[in-house]
Every structure is written in C-alpha cells, then in structure tokens.
Swiss-Prot record:
The lineage of its organism: Viruses, Duplodnaviria, Heunggongvirae, Uroviricota, Caudoviricetes. Part of a complex composed of three DNA circularization protein N, three baseplate hub protein gp44 and three sub-complex wedge (made of two copies of each baseplate protein gp46, gp47 and gp48) that forms the baseplate. InterPro entries: Phage_Mu_Gp48. GO terms for cellular component: host cell cytoplasm; virus tail, baseplate. Its main location: virion. It comes from Escherichia phage Mu. It is found in: Virion; Host cytoplasm. Component of the baseplate. This is Baseplate protein gp48.
Amino acid sequence: MAVTPWQTAFLQLLPSGLAWNKSPDSKLSALAQAISDVIATAADDARQMLRERFPSTSRWYLGEWESFLGLPDCTSENGTLSERQRAAANKMRMTGNLSRRFYEWLAAQYGFTVRLTDSTEGQWVTQVNIYGIKNYRNATVLDNVLTPLRVYESGALECLLEKYKPAHQIYKFVYHDGDN
C-alpha cells in the first residue's frame, strides 16, 4: 500500500509509543489513509477555487462569468470549455471605445476585413465596407422580392458590430468582392 503525503503528515502528528502502530499495514494507517483522501480532495478544491478568480482558468463558475460578461454572444455559441474560457478572458480584457479603429480592430479579431467611412445619408449613418466575404448565395426564384440579389452569410459580424455600436449610430453594411 502506497503512503500518501497527507497520510504521512497525519501519522507524524500522532504521539509516539507502542499504542500508536504507524506501520503501513496497520488499522491506524488505513484510518489515516481514509482521512488523507478527504483532505487531499479539499486541498484540490481549494486550489481550484483560487483558479476560479479568473475566467481563463474557471471551470465551476464559468457560467457565472459568462453571465456577468454578457456571453455567449453572437460569435461564441456552443463552444468547448477552452473556447468558452478564451472568449470570457478576451471579453474581460477588452477595453472598447467609440473610434472607428476600434470597430475595425474588433472585426479583425474575428477574421473580417472592414473599413468604416462616413455615409452621405446623414450624420448618424456610418458605412461599413466589408472586404473579401466569400460566403454568399445568389437570390433565386423562390426568394421574395425584398431579398437582395446576393445574400451574404456574415450575420456574426453584423451582430457583433451592432452590439458594440453607440445607440444613436446606424450601420449600413456594404459588401465588396475584392480586397480593399
């Protein structure tokens, strides 16, 4: 029978003498083994509780972290544990602002190339030029008359930018086939 570190520590705390048989095959050693298993589990739980302070290492309270950070959002649904931890850690570290560079950077973090420009439609309208999108389908006869001639599949990008934009701002999304 292998002697664990917690079992050894427990046996060393007991007094010496003939009444205290500390040999590995004694009943006292078996009792110390049972107690040390519980203490080892509690020590592991205490170490994990220290890791729960940060979303990148959280397992038990990851749901609470996600709720606090507003996750899952339109870009991070149904991920693995490590993907969810990474998304929560990135959201925790993110410091946003209202500049155009921030929105271009945010789109680049998700693999999109965009450029924001002023629109001629008014002060509160911004044109979001999206480059290099290859996920689209052409309209068919089964679509209704309100369907555009090309239907683009970048709903995650539009959802993401709409979530972080100021409430008074209107985004007009324009898709370009080539690079900028």
